[in-house]
């Protein structure tokens, strides 16, 4: 009988393991409107499927999993473009946003992007196979220029616009040029998997998007800082040059992609 119960325990254990594996390999359906609490799936490798509305022109895109370039093309067409914010310039309340092409590297989890779509306005099926879920309630990248702190944010859930926090997004009527404008409480705010910009240090900012180029001043600034003794990592250790990720330069956090 002891041997029988031991075998039963082994069988039960194997069944539980198999059930867990089946649950993790089953396609995970995510909401692109209200959002999905993906914390319960954090670290799991899953097949992911979701339905996302897109419009001809520039859209925004941020998801809690990675996608290959091939999966991106399968969803949005081979003519789609994928760009991320790489630098900013500030002149008074005028802020220039510099976006660069990163499509060749695919989609990285919790990274805010601009997505250019050449098809007709519709809802498309987005799928990714065996991708790792990475939970992040507030994905964002921060850039600093003069007194302007510009943050490019991803919406992990539906975020309503309010009077307290100025949030800037791309309306469909403005998406030919990726024009970021103030989103008012009268609108629906930002649905999950979309992106928006917030700004500190500048009142009533206006934005101009640039694609496929970087400002000369930003390039020179990076080169100059590479020889500076004022570059540290987040642990306070001095660096010989600016590294990828978050650096502390002259007391300010600077993101390098």
Which functions belong to the PLM regions below?
Residues 1-11:
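Bacterial N-terminal signal peptides that target proteins for export
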Residues 24-76, 101-179, 183-217, 255:
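A short, polar beta-strand/turn micro-motif
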Residues 89, 173, 198-199, 233, ...:
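Acidic surface patches and DE-rich sequence motifs
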Residues 80-102, 108:
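N-terminal low-complexity, intrinsically disordered segments
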Residues 215-257:
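C-terminal outer-membrane/trafficking sorting elements
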Residues 17-23:
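Sec/Tat signal peptide C-region and signal peptidase I cleavage site
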């Amino acid at each position: 009988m002891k041997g029988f119960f031991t075998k039963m325990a082994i069988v039960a254990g194997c069944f539980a393991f198999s059930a867990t594996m089946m649950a993790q390999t089953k396609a995970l359906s995510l909401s692109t409107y209200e959002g999905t609490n993906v914390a319960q799936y954090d670290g799991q490798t899953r097949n992911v499927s979701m339905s996302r509305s897109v419009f001809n022109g520039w859209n925004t895109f941020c998801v809690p999993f990675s996608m290959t370039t091939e999966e991106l093309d399968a969803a949005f067409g081979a003519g789609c473009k994928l760009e991320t914010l790489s630098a900013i310039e500030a002149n008074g309340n005028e802020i220039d946003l510099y976006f660069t092409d990163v499509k060749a590297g695919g989609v990285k989890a919790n990274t805010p992007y601009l997505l250019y779509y050449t098809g007709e306005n519709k809802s498309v099926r987005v799928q990714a196979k065996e991708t790792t879920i990475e939970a992040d309630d507030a994905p964002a990248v921060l850039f600093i220029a003069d007194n302007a702190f510009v943050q490019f944010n991803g919406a992990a859930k539906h975020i309503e616009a309010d009077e307290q926090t100025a949030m800037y997004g791309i309306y469909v009527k403005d998406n030919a040029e990726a024009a970021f404008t103030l989103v008012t409480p009268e609108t629906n705010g930002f649905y999950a998997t979309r992106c928006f910009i917030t700004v500190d240090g500048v009142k009533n900012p206006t934005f101009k998007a640039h694609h496929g180029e970087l400002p000369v001043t930003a390039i020179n600034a990076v080169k100059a800082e590479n020889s500076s003794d004022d570059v540290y990592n987040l642990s306070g250790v001095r660096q010989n040059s600016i590294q990828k990720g978050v650096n502390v330069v002259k007391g300010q956090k600077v993101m390098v992609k």
